């Protein structure tokens, strides 16, 4: 298994990142460079999360080998244990003269991990600090040529890059003027990594303090169906306002595009730029603008009334932003409608005596084998109406305990004697028994929980609502690039902070132990002692203050006072928005119900009259065959008596007989007769037999 686990995880993580990108992105419509950059960013960040536990278990094994070698070189002496050593014996691994080191199942040979981490780390840093911000500006640029887009992207990122260069230059000057330090390439590299990790840790603590409280509370609130439904009504009212604003903004921008489209004809030099703008517009607007277009117009006499290329670039950027905003709000509205309708269905089915879950609307996708045989309506009722709320409550309690452990460990991870960090205690207990599988699973679950708290916060806070990850291929390119940039920026300091929690970072724990390969790539933080001994230790304690503020919803109350309406339980404005959202969802439900009823009626009519047409055609075919057979038998049997029953034996006589036999009776009581073949398909003309829907009895004025 030497290196096999590493190779397997590299392949599995790649397909995981590809699957998630396919779920959220659109391979057919979005640019290849956007998809490639996002895939690479996600892949590298997922590699750090999945491979770091293997690095931890391998480091523990190598440390065991070092301790074993040190014991064999020193004589066996029975030490006298002090009270402090005895007290810490339950935490630190027991030392014996005959210590046996067991190789982990996922052992990675020496020399592989440093190269691997160096490639992963520096590639992700190039993506997050250089390429992805540039690609974001390039994708939103209004330029019509590659050169114009590159120029615009460089101008927009000048302040962005200048800020980081200023921070790096300040740290470089600080180190250069220090008399005890002699700068080398390794130390310069460490300064750059320290600057990036410091900025990442600054954002990390702010986001983590909110997520540690909000995620357990969100699951607890999800177990209360009534509260969740009321909150959904509130979100619907706010989202409808934003949706209407985006539609109005799109209409205004499309009006400007229409005016320019009518003024600039096909022989104008800027017409190709206008065509580029039109291709970014929604299809319905493209069709409207393409109807009243002349082929040629002399523009030499009206040169001053035409827009410039710069104004077209500005309009192009406005079109891109307006279309993205409109699509984002439209997708959010559809997702919110599905959630609200589902919650209303759950509320209705809770009082059902049949114990079968009934949906208000048919599912858009056909029912698969899972819902047909396993997740039946009865199983769905028990899950949605009984088990789900209790499962969410238990999960909320577990996550709350996990959050408390994280907060405690963040405040005490710098203490090594005694060991106060809970995660360090658990890892050292498993290290004593060489339970490498437990170590790797504990590391992965902890890192995954921290990543969830951090990343979900960005997409939950209202200020960051511009970025939205929507499934079913509905995420725009800007949100994909932002997510990749954010993951690459926060994952390395998050994992470094985790190594400090479990005392695997010697710069924080100050223990003479073998470092992980990941920590060795980060360099020694002792180059900047005020960061290693100050900021990295005391700044994470700010999580306590942030968690308390989040628990009492201080941020929500402040935003509400500033005019940003937030969900507050006892507030008049909140009650008005809840009522408005309830009415909006009632209208949408009636609208969707009418559409579904109309489709059902059309389907029934098509099935009914398609079957009647099929039966009528089958009857006509069988009757025609029977008549032809009877006529043939009669003709053969009465060949000698042909003159007795016919006036002549000519071919014209037989043809007239066949025409009379094939003719079908007409309904002269029918009000109208039509020869339109399209009406016969709709059931109005079914073989001459379904032309009248009136009664067959005589009317008063039939003889007039």
Swiss-Prot record:
Topological domain spans for side Cytoplasmic? 22-33, 133-157, 214-393, 460-481, 549-704
Relate the protein's function as given in its record: May associate with G-protein coupled receptors and regulate downstream signaling pathways.
Annotated Gene Ontology cellular components are: membrane; plasma membrane
The residue ranges crossing the membrane are 4-21, 34-54, 112-132, 158-178, 193-213, 394-414, 439-459, 482-502, 528-548
Q: Which family does it belong to?
A: Belongs to the LIMR family.
Where composition is biased (Polar residues), the residues are: 631-654
Q: How does it sit in the membrane?
A: Multi-pass membrane protein
Q: Which residues lie on this side of the membrane: Extracellular?
A: 1-3, 55-111, 179-192, 415-438, 503-527
Q: Which UniProt keywords apply?
A: Cell membrane, Coiled coil, Glycoprotein, Membrane, Transmembrane, Transmembrane helix
Q: Which residues are glycosylated?
A: 88
Q: Where in the cell is it found?
A: Cell membrane
Please name the GO terms of the biological process aspect recorded for this protein, alphabetically.
Answer: adrenergic receptor signaling pathway
| A Pfam family per the record | LMBR1
| Coiled-coil annotated residue ranges, if any | 235-266, 576-612
Q: Where is this region: Disordered?
A: 613-654, 672-704
**Protein name, as recorded:** G-protein coupled receptor-associated protein LMBRD2B
């Amino acid at each position: 298994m030497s290196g096999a686990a590493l190779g397997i995880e590299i392949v599995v993580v790649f397909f995981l990142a590809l699957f998630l990108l396919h779920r959220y992105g659109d391979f057919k419509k979005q640019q290849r460079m956007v998809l490639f950059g996002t895939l690479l960013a996600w892949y590298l960040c997922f590699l750090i999360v999945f491979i770091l536990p293997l690095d931890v278990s391998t480091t523990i094994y190598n440390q065991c080998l070092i301790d074993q070698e040190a014991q064999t070189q020193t004589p066996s002496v029975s030490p006298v244990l002090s009270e402090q050593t005895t007290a810490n014996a339950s935490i630190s691994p027991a030392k014996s003269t005959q210590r046996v080191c067991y190789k982990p199942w996922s052992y990675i040979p020496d020399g592989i991990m440093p190269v691997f981490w160096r490639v992963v780390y520096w590639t992700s840093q190039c993506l997050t600090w250089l390429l992805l911000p540039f690609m974001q500006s390039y994708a939103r640029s209004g330029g019509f040529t590659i050169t114009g887009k590159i120029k615009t992207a460089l101008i927009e990122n000048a302040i962005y890059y200048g800020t980081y260069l200023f921070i790096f230059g300040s740290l470089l000057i600080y180190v250069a003027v220090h008399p005890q330090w002699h700068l080398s390439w390794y130390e310069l590299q460490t300064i750059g990594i320290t600057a990036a990790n410091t900025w990442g840790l600054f954002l990390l603590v702010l986001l983590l303090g909110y997520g540690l409280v909000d995620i357990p509370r969100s699951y607890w609130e999800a177990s209360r169906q009534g509260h969740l439904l009321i909150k959904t009504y509130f979100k619907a009212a706010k989202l409808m306002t934003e949706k209407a604003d985006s539609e109005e903004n799109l209409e205004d921008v499309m009006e400007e595009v229409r005016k320019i489209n009518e003024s600039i004809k096909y022989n104008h030099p800027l017409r190709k730029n206008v065509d580029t703008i039109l291709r970014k517009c929604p299809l319905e607007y493209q069709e409207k603008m393409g109807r009243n277009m002349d082929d040629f117009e002399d523009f030499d006499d009206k040169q001053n009334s035409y827009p410039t290329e710069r104004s077209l670039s500005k309009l192009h950027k406005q079109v891109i932003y307006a279309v993205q905003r409109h699509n984002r709000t439209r997708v959010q509205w559809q997702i919110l409608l599905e959630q609200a309708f589902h919650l209303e269905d759950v509320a209705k089915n809770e009082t059902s005596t049949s114990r079968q879950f009934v949906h208000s609307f048919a599912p858009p996708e056909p029912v698969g084998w899972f819902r047909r045989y396993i997740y039946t309506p009865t199983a769905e009722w028990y899950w949605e109406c009984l088990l789900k709320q209790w499962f969410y409550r238990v999960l909320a309690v577990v996550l709350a305990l996990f959050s408390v452990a994280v907060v405690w460990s963040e405040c005490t991870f710098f203490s090594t004697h005694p060991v106060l960090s809970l995660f360090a205690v658990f890892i050292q207990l498993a290290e004593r028994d060489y339970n490498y599988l437990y170590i790797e699973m504990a590391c992965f679950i902890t890192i995954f929980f921290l990543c969830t708290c951090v990343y979900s916060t960005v997409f939950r806070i209202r200020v960051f609502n511009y970025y939205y990850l929507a499934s079913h291929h509905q995420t725009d390119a800007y949100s994909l690039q932002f997510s990749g940039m954010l993951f690459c920026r926060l994952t390395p300091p998050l994992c470094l902070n985790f190594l400090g929690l479990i005392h695997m970072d010697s710069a924080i724990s100050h223990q003479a132990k073998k470092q992980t390969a990941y920590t060795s790539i980060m360099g020694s933080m002792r180059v900047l002692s005020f960061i290693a001994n100050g900021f990295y230790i005391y700044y994470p304690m700010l999580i306590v203050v942030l968690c308390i503020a989040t628990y009492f919803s201080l941020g929500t109350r402040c935003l509400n006072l500033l005019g940003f309406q937030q969900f507050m339980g006892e507030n008049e404005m909140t009650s008005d928005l809840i009522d408005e959202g309830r009415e909006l969802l009632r209208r949408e439900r009636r609208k969707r119900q009418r559409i579904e009823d109309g489709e059902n009626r059309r389907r029934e009519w098509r099935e009914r009259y398609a079957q009647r047409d099929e039966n009528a055609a089958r009857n006509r075919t069988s009757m025609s065959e029977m008549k032809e057979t009877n006529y043939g038998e009669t003709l053969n049997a009465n060949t000698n008596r042909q003159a007795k029953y016919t006036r002549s034996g000519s071919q014209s006589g037989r043809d007239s007989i066949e025409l009379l036999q094939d003719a079908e009776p007409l309904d002269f009581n029918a009000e109208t007769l039509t020869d339109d073949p399209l009406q016969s398909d709709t059931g109005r003309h079914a073989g001459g037999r379904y032309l009248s829907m009136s009664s067959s009895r005589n009317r008063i004025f039939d003889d007039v």
